[in-house]
UniProtKB/Swiss-Prot annotation:
Name this polypeptide is given: Protein NrdI
Family matches, as SUPFAM superfamilies: Flavoproteins (SSF52218)
InterPro entries with a match to the protein in the record: Flavoprotein-like_sf (IPR029039), RNR_Ib_NrdI_bac (IPR020852), RNR_NrdI (IPR004465)
Family: Belongs to the NrdI family.
One Gene Ontology term from the biological process aspect of the record: protein modification process
Source domain of life: Bacteria
Function: Probably involved in ribonucleotide reductase function.
Gene: nrdI
Molecular function terms from GO: FMN binding
Provenance organism: Paracoccus denitrificans (strain Pd 1222)
A Pfam family recorded for this sequence: Flavodoxin_NdrI
Gene3D superfamilies tied to this protein: 3.40.50.360
C-alpha cells in the first residue's frame, strides 16, 4: 500500500479524519519554518479547501509549497479533498485544482472532519486503489 500525506490547519478537522483512518501519514506543517515530509513511496494527498467566494486561494499555501518540489509531486497518485458544503460551488475545490494541475484523480470528498461512513469509504477505497496501482516504473 502507498502512503498518505495531509495538511490540516489549526481547526484540526483534517488531522482528526486522518487519525480516525488509522493509517500512517505524514503531515505538511502549518509553519513554513518546519520541515516538510519527504515521501519515499507514492502517496495520496488529503487536503482541505480554503477558497474565497470566487474560488481563489482554494489550495493552502503550505500544500502549494509542498507540491512545488518536483520529487514530492512526482510521487503524488491521487487527492482526497475536504471542505464545507456551506460554500456551495467551492466545496472541496482544492481537490479539483490539485487534480487538474498534477494530473491525478480526485478519489473522494468529505465535509469538515468526515463521518464514520466517510472513514469506511476512504479505508476501503484506498485499499482498492493501492491494490490496482502498479508501483514499478515502466
Amino acid at each position: 500500500m502507498g502512503g498518505l500525506v495531509y495538511f490540516s490547519s489549526g481547526s484540526g478537522n483534517t488531522a482528526r479524519f486522518v487519525t480516525r483512518l488509522g493509517l500512517p501519514a505524514g503531515r505538511i506543517p502549518i509553519s513554513p519554518r518546519d520541515e516538510m515530509p519527504a515521501p519515499a513511496l507514492p502517496y495520496v494527498l488529503i487536503c482541505p479547501t480554503y477558497a474565497d467566494g470566487m474560488g481563489r486561494g482554494a489550495v493552502p499555501k503550505q500544500v502549494i509549497r509542498f507540491l512545488n518540489d518536483p520529487d514530492r509531486r512526482a510521487l503524488l497518485r491521487g487527492v482526497i479533498a475536504t471542505g464545507n458544503r456551506n460554500f456551495g460551488a467551492t466545496y472541496a475545490l482544492a481537490g479539483r485544482v490539485i487534480s487538474d494541475k498534477c494530473n491525478v484523480p480526485v478519489l473522494y470528498r468529505f465535509e469538515l472532519a468526515g463521518t464514520d461512513l466517510d472513514i469506511s469509504r476512504v479505508q476501503a477505497g484506498l485499499a482498492k486503489f493501492w491494490g490496482t496501482e502498479c508501483l514499478t516504473m515502466a
